[in-house]
């Protein structure tokens, strides 16, 4: 599910912005059924977007994407579940090419499968990627996108070393 409060775009400036964005898995009766992550973002700004490629080819092609104040909560899978997740197929034409992808003032939390234990936190981080590409060749890789260069800065982090 994707929701947002405000969407602005300018064809003349080739820009698009979303405010107060929330991402979550489809509704489910149990946290273990579907939730792998939830996310909230204060603002997403896309500059130099090619609207023709976006509409016609379903390809996001832009000069830069700035993601401001994201909060991501990730839930580990239950270790008892030995069923391997099926790799999802991507339609040819679903592509993402961006010169600069910047994540500013982010926070990441890692939780146990049921969400009862807080296992890790990384706060106040910035990640800057250059030459980001996502396509049918990268979707099934461990890191499902390619990049030319990246830089990470962070303020603080904690990890639970022993879960027992």
Could you describe each region identified by the protein language model?
Residues 1, 6-11, 84-164:
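Elongated, acidic membrane-bridging lipid-handling scaffolds
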Residues 45, 49, 60-62, 96-106:
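Long, acidic/polar, low-complexity amphipathic helices and coiled-coil-like
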Residues 3-60, 68-70, 137-143, 149-164:
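N-terminal beta-strand/beta-hairpin edge segment
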Residues 77-80:
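Outer-membrane beta-barrel translocator domains and adjoining extracellular loop/strand segments
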């Amino acid at each position: 599910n994707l929701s947002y409060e405000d969407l602005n775009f300018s064809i003349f400036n080739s820009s698009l912005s979303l405010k107060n964005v929330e991402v979550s898995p489809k509704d489910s009766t149990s946290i273990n059924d579907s939730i792998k992550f939830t996310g909230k973002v204060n603002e997403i700004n896309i500059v130099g977007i090619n609207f023709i490629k976006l509409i016609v080819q379903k390809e996001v092609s832009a000069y830069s994407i700035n993601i401001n104040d994201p909060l991501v909560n990730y839930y580990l899978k239950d270790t008892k579940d030995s069923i391997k997740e099926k790799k999802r197929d991507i339609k040819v034409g679903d592509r993402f090419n961006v010169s600069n992808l910047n994540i500013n003032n982010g926070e990441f939390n890692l939780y146990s499968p049921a969400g009862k234990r807080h296992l890790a936190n990384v706060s106040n981080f910035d990640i800057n990627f250059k030459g980001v590409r996502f396509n049918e060749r990268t979707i099934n890789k461990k890191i499902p996108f390619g990049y030319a260069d990246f830089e990470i800065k962070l303020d603080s982090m904690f990890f639970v070393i022993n879960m027992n």
